[in-house]
Amino acid sequence: MSFSTINSNVNKTTGDSNNNTTENSSTADLLGMDLLQSGPRLMNTMQPNNSSDMLHINNKTNNVQQPAGNTNISSANAGAKAPANEFVRKLFRILENNEYPDIVTWTENGKSFVVLDTGKFTTHILPNHFKHSNFASFVRQLNKYDFHKVKRSPEERQRCKYGEQSWEFQHPEFRVHYGKGLDNIKRKIPAQRKVLLDESQKALLHFNSEGTNPNNPSGSLLNESTTELLLSNTVSKDAFGNLRRRVDKLQKELDMSKMESYATKVELQKLNSKYNTVIESLITFKTINENLLNNFNTLCSTLANNGIEVPIFGDNGNRNPTGNTNPATTTAIQSNNNTNNASPATSTVSLQLPNLPDQNSLTPNAQNNTVTLRKGFHVLLVEDDAVSIQLCSKFLRKYGCTVQVVSDGLSAISTLEKYRYDLVLMDIVMPNLDGATATSIVRSFDNETPIIAMTGNIMNQDLITYLQHGMNDILAKPFTRDDLHSILIRYLKDRIPLCEQQLPPRNSSPQTHSNTNTANSNPNTINEQSLAMLPQDNPSTTTPVTPGASISSAQHVQQGQQEQQHQIFHAQQQQQHHNAIANARSDVAIPNLEHEINTVPHSSMGSTPQLPQSTLQENQLS
């Protein structure tokens, strides 16, 4: 709509009127009322297209014929109002149709409406009826149409029948069953725009008072100045459309930025949670390391209190110069076997602590693989797991050892009371009696036989307990074939199998001779009493035969004689300790009981309490 259209309408309205001077004021009033009432619309549409329109406006303004005294037309035009915004009408229809009574409804007096559940209102109503993504945007839109939230005190919110979380809004023209009041609800005008309209209204009033007076010679000048003022405060429709599109684009970008900001906030919270978890893990790891260090210090203190010196390694310049050739540094301390000592049973204890190897030095497993183990060692395997028995027996036979198997601690004690072995592999967790308690009882009558613990519990406190019960070393489960070979090399490489050790001479003292069977003077003769004390054949006990080797009949005879000597020697040794064992049997049920039995330590036994260093490799024992 332009000024030419307005003037043409004015001419049409006044075309049938007389040229009465009183009509000038009525026409001016009519024009002023229309401009005042439709000011916002005029400012959007009053931009002329070219200079010819401007001249047309000025000419029409100067040639207006003022009708005489028909004021009803003015009042009729003043009563026409633009339709209300669709936003308000949608909200009114929802409330009138009562489509969501559990979410939004009229109040009892009908002068306001209340949102009962903002969450359901956001998820059910906004996506289907409005262009708002959240409830806050909907509230801002209500404020633009001069809706106000009804404020309540905390006490009133608690007593409110609609709930404490309800939102109540009101507008003087927005009431139940009052549809005609919607035309009076319009968007609020911004402050800057109000100022411009005030200037336009002043100009129009001045135009009504001065510009339409025919006696005023400066009327045309006032008309021109008023038109210029109005046009300077308006924009073209195209410019307004471009501005509106830019605003919509900015609004979309703002919404996208909000969504991205929310997603970034969520990711930041996740990262913060992960960071806190990592910090807690590091703190826990630090605590565990401190506990391990304290336990290690306790272990070193315990070893020092028991007379075992722990070497202290300095820097690279103060290390043992032979560290490149020796894989371990051995510190041996032998206590005096004094009967007046508080501890009745003493033995030789040696501690092997690994030295830091040089880059060119061989690993312990590689060095152990180069050492050949003598054949003929007799090993007692105390294990209750069938798979471990099968695999361990297979490895022991491969290394030339004979194996006897028992499945619990009590059987191990009974077997060690009757027979002697070069080495004992003792499991810890077994039925009837555990391995640690069984070892402490065995040490009451046998301090010579090396006993190796086979266990998966390798905590520092457990290792200290095993060593205190008399075990020499620990073979940590799961272990490999090389780990088992390393243990055998460590304890048997410098020993002579019991079956090959020399028997007591024939011309011994009468007392010794009386305790020795006369048939033992001939190594090739086996006494029936000695055979009765020999261990029965076990399915797991076999004589090792090297694969691929050709054994003649003479070798078979010689091997049988060596086995007979081994068995006779076992019988003789156990006969000598029979009386001491009988006294210790009464204390079998009491673990860690000290007995006054002094046994001469074996000179060739290298008892080495050492922490397990096995590595999980192929052929593991579970």
UniProtKB/Swiss-Prot annotation:
Cellular component terms (Gene Ontology): cytosol; nucleus
UniProt PTM comment: The phosphorelay mechanism involves the sequential transfer of a phosphate group from 'His-576' (H1) to 'Asp-1144' (D1) of SLN1, then to 'His-64' (H2) of YPD1 and finally to Asp-427 (D2) of SKN7.
SUPFAM superfamilies, alphabetized: CheY-like (SSF52172), Winged helix' DNA-binding domain (SSF46785)
Effect in UniProt of substituting D427N: Diminishes activity
Signal peptide: none
Residues covered by region (Disordered): 1-29, 501-579, 599-622
SMART domains the UniProt entry points to: HSF, REC
Subcellular location: Nucleus
A GO biological-process term: transcription elongation by RNA polymerase II
GO molecular-function terms, A-Z: DNA-binding transcription factor activity; phosphorelay response regulator activity; sequence-specific DNA binding
Modified residues (4-aspartylphosphate): D427
Polar residues bias: start-end ranges: 1-12, 537-554, 600-622
UniProt feature coiled coil, ranges: 240-260
Chain segments carrying region Hydrophobic repeat HR-A/B: 212-303
Boundaries of every Response regulatory domain copy: 378-492
Transmembrane segments: none
Primary localisation category: nucleus
Region called DNA-binding domain, residue ranges: 84-190
Annotated InterPro entries: CheY-like_superfamily, HSF_DNA-bd, Sig_transdc_resp-reg_receiver, Sig_transdc_resp-reg_Skn7, WH-like_DNA-bd_sf, WH_DNA-bd_sf
Disulfide bond positions: none
Biased segments, Low complexity type: 13-27, 512-527, 555-578
General function of this protein: Transcription factor that is part of a SLN1-YPD1-SKN7 two-component regulatory system, which controls gene expression in response to changes in the osmolarity of the extracellular environment. Under low osmotic conditions, phosphorylated and activated by the phosphorelay intermediate protein YPD1. Also activated in response to oxidative stress, independent on the two-component regulatory system. Regulates heat shock genes in response to oxidative stress and genes involved in cell wall integrity in response to osmotic changes.
SUBUNIT field: Homotrimer.
Other comments on record: Present with 2570 molecules/cell in log phase SD medium.
Free-text domain note: Homotrimerization occurs through formation of a three-stranded coiled-coil structure generated by intermolecular interactions between HR-A/B regions allowing DNA-binding activity.
Protein name per Swiss-Prot or TrEMBL: Transcription factor SKN7
Organism this protein belongs to: Saccharomyces cerevisiae (strain ATCC 204508 / S288c)
